[in-house]
Amino acid sequence: MANAALIEALRAADAVQFGEFELSHGGTSSYYVDKYLFETDPRCLKLIAEAFAERVADDDKLAGVALGAVPLVAATAVETNKPYVIARKKAKEYGTAKRIEGALDEGEEVVVLEDIATTGQSAVDAVEALREAGAVVDRVVVVVDRQEGAAELLADHDIALESLLTAEDLLADADG
């Protein structure tokens, strides 16, 4: 069953919007889930961190995909008292020039936390970077799965997709 409190919080934060929107992959949609509105809303952030915490195993290290999932993974780290790493899309060209920020040991089991899954490509990229760094990753947990192919793409890379909410959950009974 969908998390009714989280749905209500996302709607109250105006994070679910209706109209014509261009998505990051170039497609268009009649609705938009504004991650910046829910990631900067304390009530949403608390509910998300609590829900993510329920899905994290005792031996999991947390990882967040930069930039969008950083507030989510940080809040979940506080909720679970677990350290986390940040997976960048590409290495910085300055400083340490790393794709993975934070301490990560070879063989550590990592669960990736992400904001929204549409195609799933950013999650796949993060998992590949973590695996290249020696992590064992087989699971991504997202706030919202837009149900537009992410689960299938991730499955092709031996990654399970779990979501707190699906587009179907979020749009049920919506006034759009």
From Swiss-Prot:
Knockout or disruption consequences: Auxotroph for uracil and resistant to 5-FOA (5-fluoroorotic acid).
Catalytic activity line of the entry: orotidine 5'-phosphate + diphosphate = orotate + 5-phospho-alpha-D-ribose 1-diphosphate
Keywords tagged on the record: Glycosyltransferase, Magnesium, Pyrimidine biosynthesis, Transferase
Binding-site residues, 5-phospho-alpha-D-ribose 1-diphosphate: R88, K89, K92, E114, D115, I116, A117, T118, T119, G120, Q121, S122
Cofactor(s) listed: Mg(2+)
First-tier enzyme category under EC: transferase
E.C. number(s) listed in UniProt: 2.4.2.10
One Gene Ontology term from the biological process aspect of the record: pyrimidine nucleobase biosynthetic process
Annotated positions binding orotate: T118, R146
One family name in Pfam for this protein: Pribosyltran
MF annotations from Gene Ontology: magnesium ion binding; orotate phosphoribosyltransferase activity
Annotated metabolic or biological route of this protein: Pyrimidine metabolism; UMP biosynthesis via de novo pathway; UMP from orotate: step 1/2
Function: Catalyzes the transfer of a ribosyl phosphate group from 5-phosphoribose 1-diphosphate to orotate, leading to the formation of orotidine monophosphate (OMP).
Quaternary state and interactors: Homodimer.
Family as reported in the entry's similarity comment: Belongs to the purine/pyrimidine phosphoribosyltransferase family. PyrE subfamily.
Name of the protein in question: Orotate phosphoribosyltransferase
Naturally occurring in which organism (per UniProt): Haloferax volcanii (strain ATCC 29605 / DSM 3757 / JCM 8879 / NBRC 14742 / NCIMB 2012 / VKM B-1768 / DS2) (Halobacterium volcanii)
